[in-house]
Regions:
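Conserved ABC transporter NBD signature motif
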Residues: 60-68
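H-loop (His-switch) and adjacent beta-strand-loop-beta switch element
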Residues: 198-214
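ABC ATPase NBD coupling module
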Residues: 68-82
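Conserved structural motif at the start of ABC-family nucleotide-binding domains
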Residues: 6, 21-23
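The feature captures the beta-strand-to-loop junction immediately N-terminal to the Walker
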Residues: 37-39
Length: 233
């Protein structure tokens, strides 16, 4: 059986008296890719942040790449557990090339910069980029830092929300290729068409897990109304 790379059991989190996660449980093994869907405020970002170890107050069992990310030193899984925020913070005067250098893998960065059509933007400060270009630069830096797909856990929060079609397709291909190479990938997305391409769909509603299975089973009429408010295509 493939390695268990993410295990959540009875995970809960509150903020200002509001329950953001309510007893969520799920697991991901090497080679699995799952789409995480839900309406705004359903708890998708909170779940990804908990799995990434950024919510130290979250309760329940959280194991990511064999460690509890709430207590493990950040360096312990720096290149095996990768988290992409939807709106990453950045130094606005930093150039695209300087951001890429943080991956500390020049050849890999050059490859991803080319794939994402960032090469011509290398000397541009992040502040001068469009939202989509900035998101792409952060994704390229993150992807370049992945040394070995097998055994890695990728947690991606709306990675294609601001991207153009060509860059979206690059992300789509990379995500599925990594899963095939043995990574575990959990992707929060509002893109119903992309979510349907995943072998597994996990759905949240008001912090609770309401569906977990293949798209044909998870995409019920109730889920589609709750998340998209209309038939999802």
């Amino acid at each position: 059986m493939a390695d268990l790379l993410l295990q959540l059991s009875r995970v809960a989190h509150e903020r200002n008296g509001r329950r953001l996660l309510d007893g969520v449980g799920l697991s991901l093994r090497a080679g699995e890719a799952a789409a995480l869907v839900g309406a705004n405020g359903a708890g998708k970002t909170t779940l990804l942040r908990a799995a990434a170890g950024l919510l130290h107050a979250a309760t329940g069992e959280i194991t990511a790449t064999g460690l509890d990310p709430r207590t493990a030193p950040p360096a312990a899984a720096a290149r095996r557990r990768l988290y992409a925020e939807q709106h990453p913070s950045c130094a606005w005067d930093q150039t695209v090339a300087e951001l890429g250098a943080l991956a500390d893998r020049p050849a890999a960065w050059a490859d991803w910069a080319e794939r994402f059509a960032l090469t011509a933007l290398a000397e541009r400060p992040l502040a001068s980029l469009s939202g989509g270009e900035r998101q792409t630069a952060h994704l390229a830096r993150l992807f370049a830092s992945l040394e070995e797909p097998y055994g890695a856990l990728l947690l991606l929060d709306e990675p294609t929300a601001a991207l153009d079609r060509a860059r979206r397709e690059t992300v789509h291909a990379a995500v599925h290729a990594w899963a095939q190479a043995g990574a575990a990938v959990l992707v929060a997305t509002h893109d119903a068409a992309w979510a349907r391409t995943f072998p597994r769909v996990v759905a949240l509603e008001e912090g609770r897990l309401i569906a977990d299975g293949p798209p044909a089973a998870a995409f019920t009429a109730e889920l589609v109304r709750a998340v998209w408010g209309a038939p999802a295509t």
